[in-house]
Regions:
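Rossmann-fold NAD(P) dinucleotide-binding segment
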Residues: 48-61, 69-85
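Glycine-rich phosphate/diphosphate-binding loop of Rossmann-like nucleotide-binding domains
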Residues: 1-58
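Adenosine-phosphate binding glycine-rich loop
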Residues: 78-192
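Short acidic, glycine/serine/threonine-rich loops at helix termini
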Residues: 6, 13-23, 75, 98-100, ...
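Beta-loop-alpha module in the N-terminal Rossmann-like domain of NAD(P)-dependent dehydrogenases
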Residues: 66-74, 94-97
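Flexible, active-site-adjacent loop/turn segments at secondary-structure boundaries
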Residues: 9, 15, 20-23, 69, ...
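Short, well-ordered coil/turn residues at beta-beta hairpins
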Residues: 63-65, 90
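Structural motif
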Residues: 1-3, 46-47, 60-61, 84-87, ...
Length: 192
């Protein structure tokens, strides 16, 4: 991770943001002073860019994590121009429709929030299952089950999203997989 954004702009740290640096960012956020500028003062090899968004930085992977529509069409063009390889939508609807269209048109690996965020929903489901069965799984058991669920989601996206040229349209795959799951459940219940 080389960038972190806030309402005041973003920081770029070519040395990477990990360990003590993440702890410092968490301290900044916990203080109620939700800004990132002090990071550049504490870590002088980093740069603070006021009033801008991190999508102009050359990166291999972009992860919109904060709010809906935080990555727009112009941001997508910057990422594409800078040869981004993969975009993973961590926040719900982190990318605008224009950004998504640009990623798909350029055949980039774009993982939509409905597939990426499924891990959180799945973990909640696993927790409810444990509670209902009055059981307690180890962290490793939960992690193994979560990996299995996420692998299955990926396989469904590949199954339904692979285009004739081999490009995997994860949006299409996730949408069709979601539809198929609901349709099969309705048929199993005799609704359709």
């Amino acid at each position: 991770m080389v960038t972190i954004s806030g309402p005041d702009g973003y920081i770029y740290d070519p040395d990477g943001v990990s360990g003590d640096k993440i702890d410092y960012i968490l301290e900044l956020r916990a203080s109620g002073n939700d800004i990132v500028a002090p990071y550049a003062e504490k870590y002088p090899n980093s740069t603070f860019v006021a009033g801008r968004r991190p999508w102009e930085v050359k990166v291999d992977i972009a992860l919109p994590c904060a709010t809906q529509n935080e990555l727009n069409g112009e941001d997508a063009c910057n990422l594409i121009k800078n040869s981004v390889l993969c975009i993973g939508e961590i926040s719900n609807m982190g990318c605008t429709p224009e950004a998504i269209d640009a990623f798909i048109e350029n055949k980039l690996m774009y993982a939509p929030g409905k597939a990426v965020n499924a891990g959180g929903v799945a973990t909640s489901g696993l927790e409810m299952s444990q509670n209902a069965m009055h059981m307690s799984w180890s962290a490793q058991e939960v992690d193994d089950k979560l990996h299995q669920i996420m692998y299955g989601i990926h396989e469904q996206c590949v199954k339904y999203g692979t285009e004739p040229d081999g490009y995997i349209n994860y949006v299409k795959g996730a949408n069709i997989a979601g539809f198929m799951k609901v349709a099969h459940a309705m048929m199993a219940q005799g609704i359709v």
